[in-house]
Amino acid sequence: MECCGPGYSSTQEAIKAPNEKLLYTIAIYTGTGIQKPDYLATVDVDPESPTYSQVIHRLEMPGIGDELHHMGWNACSSCHDDSSMSRKFLILPGVRSNNLHIVDTATDPRAPRLHKIIDGAEIKGKADLSGPHTVHCLGSEIIISFLGNAKGEAPGGYLQLDKDFNIVGRWENSMGDIKFGYDFWYQPRHNIMVSSEWAAPNTFMPLSLIHI
């Protein structure tokens, strides 16, 4: 059953879909001593293409030391039935810089371009959060887990963005007994969200491998 929205209505439908022809992955320089910006690499995975298995584009971030981490789409399978939604943007958090990089993958999928940056200082000021980690969509909006508050202390929280990537504010009412932030996923039909724990930003920033 076809639909105009993003994603697929079920795992079975996703299995039937055509193979991807492009892959996006991040490349970072954290811990290498190399003072260059992290970048988003576009990889050609179409076996019929002359550039098959090659990195065909690199989108460098404007700054140095972001440590790009998990990334996510602006829209996902939860809006599969909404024809007004589409996967146009990737959100790339910098876990060290606290910046959120919004990347346009729709204009030219083979050469993504930077659409917007949400500065980490703005996030600290408006939402008291740092250490962005996991990106998931909530219908037309986006939620991002953070490992710490503006001072880098646990437990962090969740930042909500609108569809135009403006800061709405904190998504959660309370972190309750949660001691640390990390990854998460939600099941709207069951009215639950499951999160896991890792560490506060101050635990690993700064960090030297000689201390491990």
Where do the PLM segments sit?
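Structural signature of eukaryotic scaffold interfaces centered on beta-propeller domains
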Residues: E2-N19, L68-S86, D128-L138, W185-N191
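Conserved small-residue
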Residues: T11-E13, V45, S49, T203-S208
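Beta-propeller domains
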Residues: K16-N19, I26-H69, H80-M85, L92-D119, ...
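His-enriched metal-coordination microenvironments in redox/metal-binding proteins
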Residues: D66-H70, G94, H133, F180-D183, ...
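Structural signal for beta-propeller blades
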Residues: N98-L100, K151-G152, Y158, N202
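Asp-box/WD-like beta-propeller blade repeats and closely related beta-sheet repeat scaffolds
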Residues: T105-W185
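Conserved small/polar residues in nucleotide/adenosyl-binding loops
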Residues: I210-I212
